[in-house]
Amino acid sequence: MKIVLATGNAGKVRELSELLAGTGITILPQSDFGVPEAEENGLSFVENAILKARNAAAHTGLPAIADDSGIEVDALNGSPGIYSARYAGPGGDAEANNRKLLKALEHVESSQRTARFRCVMVYLRHADDPSPVIAEGSWEGRIASEARGPGGHGYDPIFEIPELELTAAEISPAEKNRRSHRGQALRILLERLQGR
Protein backbone atom coordinates (compact mmCIF):
# COMPACT_ATOMS: atom_id res chain seq x y z
CA MET A 1 0.00 0.00 0.00
CA LYS A 2 1.30 3.47 -0.88
CA ILE A 3 0.66 6.30 1.55
CA VAL A 4 1.82 9.88 1.28
CA LEU A 5 3.56 11.20 4.38
CA ALA A 6 2.49 14.77 5.00
CA THR A 7 5.79 16.32 6.00
CA GLY A 8 8.80 18.00 4.49
CA ASN A 9 10.91 17.01 7.52
CA ALA A 10 13.59 14.57 6.31
CA GLY A 11 14.12 13.29 9.87
CA LYS A 12 10.46 12.30 10.18
CA VAL A 13 10.48 10.63 6.75
CA ARG A 14 13.53 8.57 7.71
CA GLU A 15 12.13 7.68 11.14
CA LEU A 16 8.71 6.59 9.84
CA SER A 17 10.23 4.65 6.94
CA GLU A 18 12.35 2.70 9.45
CA LEU A 19 9.32 2.07 11.66
CA LEU A 20 7.24 0.82 8.71
CA ALA A 21 9.91 -1.49 7.28
CA GLY A 22 8.38 -4.90 6.64
CA THR A 23 4.74 -3.81 6.98
CA GLY A 24 3.95 -3.68 3.26
CA ILE A 25 3.36 0.06 3.51
CA THR A 26 5.45 2.31 1.31
CA ILE A 27 5.81 5.86 2.54
CA LEU A 28 6.11 8.50 -0.16
CA PRO A 29 7.10 11.94 1.12
CA GLN A 30 4.79 14.73 -0.01
CA SER A 31 7.83 16.47 -1.51
CA ASP A 32 7.86 13.75 -4.21
CA PHE A 33 4.57 15.25 -5.43
CA GLY A 34 5.38 18.94 -4.97
CA VAL A 35 2.75 19.24 -2.24
CA PRO A 36 2.92 22.64 -0.52
CA GLU A 37 3.22 22.68 3.25
CA ALA A 38 -0.14 22.98 5.00
CA GLU A 39 -0.72 26.01 7.17
CA GLU A 40 -0.55 24.75 10.75
CA ASN A 41 -3.10 27.07 12.30
CA GLY A 42 -4.81 24.54 14.54
CA LEU A 43 -4.87 24.97 18.30
CA SER A 44 -3.87 21.39 19.08
CA PHE A 45 -1.65 18.60 17.81
CA VAL A 46 -4.79 16.77 16.58
CA GLU A 47 -6.05 19.74 14.56
CA ASN A 48 -2.66 20.35 12.95
CA ALA A 49 -2.19 16.68 12.04
CA ILE A 50 -5.62 16.56 10.38
CA LEU A 51 -4.91 19.77 8.44
CA LYS A 52 -1.63 18.32 7.14
CA ALA A 53 -3.14 14.94 6.20
CA ARG A 54 -6.07 16.55 4.34
CA ASN A 55 -3.69 18.82 2.44
CA ALA A 56 -1.45 15.92 1.34
CA ALA A 57 -4.37 13.67 0.38
CA ALA A 58 -6.05 16.48 -1.58
CA HIS A 59 -2.90 17.21 -3.60
CA THR A 60 -1.96 13.58 -4.31
CA GLY A 61 -5.18 11.58 -4.35
CA LEU A 62 -3.48 9.06 -2.05
CA PRO A 63 -4.21 8.05 1.52
CA ALA A 64 -2.17 10.19 3.89
CA ILE A 65 -0.46 9.94 7.24
CA ALA A 66 0.44 13.11 9.08
CA ASP A 67 1.72 13.76 12.52
CA ASP A 68 2.02 16.79 14.65
CA SER A 69 4.40 16.56 17.50
CA GLY A 70 6.29 18.68 19.90
CA ILE A 71 7.89 18.92 23.26
CA GLU A 72 6.04 20.01 26.39
CA VAL A 73 8.12 21.32 29.29
CA ASP A 74 6.42 21.33 32.69
CA ALA A 75 8.44 24.28 34.05
CA LEU A 76 7.18 26.30 31.04
CA ASN A 77 3.52 25.30 31.50
CA GLY A 78 3.66 22.92 28.54
CA SER A 79 5.49 25.22 26.13
CA PRO A 80 6.67 25.13 23.43
CA GLY A 81 3.95 22.52 22.66
CA ILE A 82 2.34 22.99 19.24
CA TYR A 83 4.84 25.77 18.53
CA SER A 84 7.89 23.49 19.00
CA ALA A 85 9.08 23.66 15.37
CA ARG A 86 8.98 27.45 15.32
CA TYR A 87 9.79 28.13 18.99
CA ALA A 88 12.76 30.37 18.12
CA GLY A 89 10.99 31.89 15.10
CA PRO A 90 9.78 30.90 11.64
CA GLY A 91 11.87 28.48 9.65
CA GLY A 92 12.17 25.66 12.15
CA ASP A 93 15.87 25.99 13.00
CA ALA A 94 16.43 23.10 15.44
CA GLU A 95 19.64 24.49 16.92
CA ALA A 96 18.03 27.88 17.57
CA ASN A 97 15.02 26.16 19.16
CA ASN A 98 17.30 24.11 21.40
CA ARG A 99 19.32 27.18 22.42
CA LYS A 100 16.15 29.11 23.28
CA LEU A 101 14.77 26.25 25.36
CA LEU A 102 18.05 25.77 27.23
CA LYS A 103 18.18 29.52 27.92
CA ALA A 104 14.60 29.50 29.24
CA LEU A 105 15.55 26.72 31.68
CA GLU A 106 19.06 27.85 32.65
CA HIS A 107 18.04 28.63 36.26
CA VAL A 108 15.72 25.63 36.65
CA GLU A 109 16.93 22.68 38.75
CA SER A 110 17.41 19.36 36.95
CA SER A 111 14.58 17.76 38.95
CA GLN A 112 12.20 20.48 37.71
CA ARG A 113 13.11 20.10 34.01
CA THR A 114 10.59 17.35 33.33
CA ALA A 115 9.24 17.21 29.81
CA ARG A 116 7.64 14.96 27.27
CA PHE A 117 7.59 14.53 23.57
CA ARG A 118 4.00 14.21 22.35
CA CYS A 119 2.93 12.94 18.93
CA VAL A 120 -0.51 12.75 17.36
CA MET A 121 -0.66 10.73 14.16
CA VAL A 122 -3.58 10.78 11.74
CA TYR A 123 -4.48 8.54 8.81
CA LEU A 124 -6.98 9.64 6.14
CA ARG A 125 -8.19 7.35 3.34
CA HIS A 126 -8.84 10.44 1.19
CA ALA A 127 -9.03 14.22 1.59
CA ASP A 128 -12.73 14.18 2.52
CA ASP A 129 -12.49 11.22 4.92
CA PRO A 130 -15.01 12.00 7.69
CA SER A 131 -13.47 9.44 10.07
CA PRO A 132 -9.75 10.03 10.53
CA VAL A 133 -7.87 7.35 12.43
CA ILE A 134 -6.07 9.13 15.28
CA ALA A 135 -3.34 7.77 17.55
CA GLU A 136 -1.25 9.44 20.22
CA GLY A 137 2.07 8.66 21.87
CA SER A 138 4.13 10.38 24.53
CA TRP A 139 7.68 9.94 25.81
CA GLU A 140 8.58 11.18 29.29
CA GLY A 141 11.99 12.62 30.05
CA ARG A 142 13.69 15.84 31.07
CA ILE A 143 15.60 18.64 29.43
CA ALA A 144 19.37 18.22 29.73
CA SER A 145 21.60 21.12 30.72
CA GLU A 146 23.34 21.05 27.32
CA ALA A 147 22.98 19.46 23.90
CA ARG A 148 24.59 16.01 23.61
CA GLY A 149 24.79 13.39 20.89
CA PRO A 150 25.17 13.20 17.13
CA GLY A 151 21.93 11.42 16.22
CA GLY A 152 18.27 12.23 15.90
CA HIS A 153 16.78 15.55 14.94
CA GLY A 154 14.92 18.47 16.49
CA TYR A 155 15.01 18.49 20.29
CA ASP A 156 16.66 15.03 20.53
CA PRO A 157 20.07 16.41 21.64
CA ILE A 158 18.53 18.05 24.74
CA PHE A 159 15.85 15.46 25.60
CA GLU A 160 17.30 13.23 28.29
CA ILE A 161 15.99 9.76 29.12
CA PRO A 162 16.40 9.63 32.92
CA GLU A 163 16.78 5.85 33.26
CA LEU A 164 19.58 5.84 30.66
CA GLU A 165 21.13 9.22 31.48
CA LEU A 166 21.47 9.68 27.73
CA THR A 167 19.76 12.06 25.34
CA ALA A 168 17.59 10.85 22.48
CA ALA A 169 20.46 11.88 20.18
CA GLU A 170 22.86 9.53 22.01
CA ILE A 171 20.88 6.31 21.57
CA SER A 172 20.66 4.13 18.47
CA PRO A 173 17.90 4.75 15.95
CA ALA A 174 16.44 1.31 16.78
CA GLU A 175 16.33 2.12 20.50
CA LYS A 176 14.81 5.52 19.78
CA ASN A 177 12.12 3.98 17.57
CA ARG A 178 11.29 1.49 20.33
CA ARG A 179 10.85 4.21 22.96
CA SER A 180 9.75 7.31 21.08
CA HIS A 181 6.43 9.11 21.04
CA ARG A 182 6.33 8.78 17.25
CA GLY A 183 7.03 5.04 17.41
CA GLN A 184 4.27 4.61 20.00
CA ALA A 185 1.77 6.60 17.95
CA LEU A 186 2.61 4.70 14.77
CA ARG A 187 2.26 1.29 16.45
CA ILE A 188 -1.17 2.32 17.81
CA LEU A 189 -2.17 3.71 14.40
CA LEU A 190 -1.17 0.47 12.64
CA GLU A 191 -3.19 -1.58 15.16
CA ARG A 192 -6.23 0.60 14.52
CA LEU A 193 -5.81 0.38 10.75
CA GLN A 194 -5.62 -3.41 10.89
CA GLY A 195 -8.89 -3.38 12.84
CA ARG A 196 -10.72 -1.42 10.10
Curated annotation (Swiss-Prot):
Cofactor(s) recorded for this entry are: Mg(2+)
* Lineage top rank: taxon: Bacteria
EC main group: hydrolase
Q: Which reaction does it catalyse?
A: XTP + H2O = XMP + diphosphate + H(+); dITP + H2O = dIMP + diphosphate + H(+); ITP + H2O = IMP + diphosphate + H(+)
InterPro entries, sorted: dITP/XTP_pyrophosphatase, ITPase-like_fam, RdgB/HAM1
Which residues does the entry assign to the active site, renumbered to this chain? Answer: 68 (proton acceptor)
Instruction: Look up the EC number in the record and give it.
Output: 3.6.1.66
Q: Choose any GO biological process term that the UniProt entry carries and state it.
A: purine nucleoside triphosphate catabolic process
Q: Which family does it belong to?
A: Belongs to the HAM1 NTPase family.
Q: State its role.
A: Pyrophosphatase that catalyzes the hydrolysis of nucleoside triphosphates to their monophosphate derivatives, with a high preference for the non-canonical purine nucleotides XTP (xanthosine triphosphate), dITP (deoxyinosine triphosphate) and ITP. Seems to function as a house-cleaning enzyme that removes non-canonical purine nucleotides from the nucleotide pool, thus preventing their incorporation into DNA/RNA and avoiding chromosomal lesions.
Q: How does it assemble?
A: Homodimer.
Report the protein name in the record. Answer: dITP/XTP pyrophosphatase
Organism of this sequence? Thioalkalivibrio sulfidiphilus (strain HL-EbGR7)
